[in-house]
């Protein structure tokens, strides 16, 4: 099988040296992602496209799906590459490929040609289109807005029959811009802002301020791992977790109620800036949107920025909540966000929307900054690829099984879309569907006299959720592996 990768248009207008660098980086990113599916595949770069050739037909859908999620790719063409002799040979091959698709449909033929030939692209379009129209009685030519467009590419003595076109996410290849550190909470905003910087070519590391215990961190780890695995797995990134409960406790004890929200955000920026400096990261990323909450007014955002020289990027600054939620739905983080607890908003009953710098600084003089230094020093830094392994160690008490007993039920915790695409059927045992994002509220409604074997495709989510359910007091859970 063969795929032709078309570049994001902004790449093609770069200078020659920059364009070559971007294409080289994108080629490496594609190799890094696809090697997990087929180690023998070939990735070949050209001036205006990249070819991917693979032998394992069983991995075709997985490879195609992975390509649509790699930043820097505008669209993917799945093609059949065959030799041809003349225009009539091109027509005959197109007829075999497209006959079924054109039955009862309007169509047109579009051809791109490279190389030396005794015919033009328009000649091929007319010849092939006329032939298809004659040989498929129910088909009809329509040059404007046809139901089916027959795409052909002719290059020297090779014909590319385009079997399908699939849109990519666009943007720049990861690694073409510098690293950033995303302040991730697991909610709608931080997930979308992280994705937007990945799509713009940045390697995104994650910094999480834990305000709600182990269950909260597990949830945010899931979001970060999902984003990395889906859009950024071509690169290694860090997940830094900072226990911010001592900082919140100090704020609650010593800071005036109205100033708490702004001061908490200032403390987070101070801490994140220290982490960024430690690892040589150029900028922070937040999901703040202008006026969304009290700490996100222009006055308050300026006061928050003033505590650090580190650049703070806010890709969602002009977005409304509905737009952000729609983006979260598109990238697959909506379900995570809907079940993620929100802690920041509860610490202040009457937050100021227009903080005064002198008052903020006066309140911060009461704060013991050694607490902030300590939590940053003790921050837990892991390679995001190790989250799955670390979770295995953390859930040692949760048994992993590949068999089942008479009282067992498999609980498929994948998202509904994944379950519909690849239904799970295991002979000899019932399979019940309960997506991971409903476990926290719906697991207790299940028959607690049964043993529930949590299953997901890679085993990461099932182990994380098993740990969460154990913490909630459910001991009738195991992790199931096929």
From Swiss-Prot:
Catalytic activity: [ThiI sulfur-carrier protein]-S-sulfanyl-L-cysteine + a uridine in tRNA + 2 reduced [2Fe-2S]-[ferredoxin] + ATP + H(+) = [ThiI sulfur-carrier protein]-L-cysteine + a 4-thiouridine in tRNA + 2 oxidized [2Fe-2S]-[ferredoxin] + AMP + diphosphate; [ThiS sulfur-carrier protein]-C-terminal Gly-Gly-AMP + S-sulfanyl-L-cysteinyl-[cysteine desulfurase] + AH2 = [ThiS sulfur-carrier protein]-C-terminal-Gly-aminoethanethioate + L-cysteinyl-[cysteine desulfurase] + A + AMP + 2 H(+)
Location of the THUMP domain: 61-165
Tagged with keyword Transferase: yes
GO terms of biological process kind: thiamine biosynthetic process; thiamine diphosphate biosynthetic process; thiazole biosynthetic process; tRNA 4-thiouridine biosynthesis
InterPro entries per record: Rhodanese-like_dom (IPR001763), Rhodanese-like_dom_sf (IPR036873), Rossmann-like_a/b/a_fold (IPR014729), ThiI_AANH (IPR020536), ThiI_fer (IPR054173), ThiI_N (IPR049961), THII_Thiazole_biosynth_dom (IPR026340), THUMP_dom (IPR004114)
Protein name: tRNA sulfurtransferase
Binding site for ATP: 183-184, 265, 287, 296
Keywords associated with the record: ATP-binding, Cytoplasm, Disulfide bond, Nucleotide-binding, Redox-active center, RNA-binding, Thiamine biosynthesis, Transferase, tRNA-binding
Disulfide bridge partners, by residue number: 344-456
Keyword match Amino-acid biosynthesis: no
Record gene name: thiI
Organismal lineage: Bacteria, Pseudomonadati, Pseudomonadota, Gammaproteobacteria, Enterobacterales
The protein's Enzyme Commission number: 2.8.1.4
UniProt family annotation: Belongs to the ThiI family.
């Amino acid at each position: 099988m063969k795929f032709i990768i078309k570049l994001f248009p902004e790449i093609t207008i770069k200078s020659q040296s920059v364009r070559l660098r971007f294409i080289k980086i994108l080629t490496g990113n594609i190799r890094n992602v696809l090697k997990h599916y087929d180690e023998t595949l070939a990735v070949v770069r050209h001036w205006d496209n990249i070819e991917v050739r693979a032998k394992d037909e069983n991995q075709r859908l997985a490879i195609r799906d992975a390509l649509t999620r790699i930043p820097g790719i505008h669209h993917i063409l799945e093609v059949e590459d065959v030799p041809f002799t003349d225009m009539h040979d091109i027509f005959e091959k197109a007829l075999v490929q497209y006959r079924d698709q054109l039955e009862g449909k309007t169509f047109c033929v579009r051809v791109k040609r490279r190389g030396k030939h005794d015919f033009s692209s328009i000649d091929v379009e007319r010849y092939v289109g006329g032939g298809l129209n004659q040989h498929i009685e129910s088909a009809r030519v329509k040059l404007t807005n046809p139901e089916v467009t027959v795409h052909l590419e002719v290059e020297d003595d090779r014909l590319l029959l385009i079997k399908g076109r699939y849109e990519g996410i666009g943007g720049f290849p990861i690694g073409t811009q510098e690293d950033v550190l995303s302040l991730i909470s697991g909610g709608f905003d931080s997930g979308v802002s992280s994705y937007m910087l990945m799509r713009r070519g940045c390697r995104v590391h994650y910094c999480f301020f834990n305000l709600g215990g182990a269950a909260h961190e597990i949830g945010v780890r899931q979001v970060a791992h999902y984003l990395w695995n889906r859009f950024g797995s071509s690169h290694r990134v860090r997940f830094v977790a900072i226990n911010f409960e001592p900082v919140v406790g100090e704020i609650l004890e010593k800071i005036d109620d109205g100033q708490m929200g702004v001061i908490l955000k200032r403390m987070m920026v101070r801490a994140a800036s220290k982490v960024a400096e430690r690892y040589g990261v150029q900028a922070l990323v937040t999901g703040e949107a202008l006026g969304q909450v009290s700490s996100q007014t222009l006055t308050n955002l300026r006061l928050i920025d003033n505590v650090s020289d580190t650049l703070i990027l806010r890709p969602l600054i002009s977005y409304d909540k509905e737009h952000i939620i729609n983006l979260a739905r598109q990238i697959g983080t909506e379900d995570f966000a809907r079940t993620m607890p929100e802690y920041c908003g509860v610490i202040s009953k009457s937050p100021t929307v227009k903080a005064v710098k002198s008052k903020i600084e006066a309140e911060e003089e009461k704060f013991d900054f050694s607490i902030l230094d300590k939590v940053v020093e003790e921050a837990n830094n892991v390679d995001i690829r190790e989250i799955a392994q670390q979770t295995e160690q953390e859930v040692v008490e949760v048994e992993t099984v590949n068999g089942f007993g008479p009282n067992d039920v498999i609980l498929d915790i994948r998202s509904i879309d994944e379950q519909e695409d690849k239904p799970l059927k295991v002979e000899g045992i019932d399979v019940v569907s309960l997506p991971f994002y409903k476990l926290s509220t719906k697991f207790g409604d299940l028959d607690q006299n049964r043993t529930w074997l949590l299953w997901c495709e890679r085993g990461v989510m099932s182990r994380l959720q098993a740990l969460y359910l154990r913490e909630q007091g459910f001991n009738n859970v195991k992790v199931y592996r096929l």
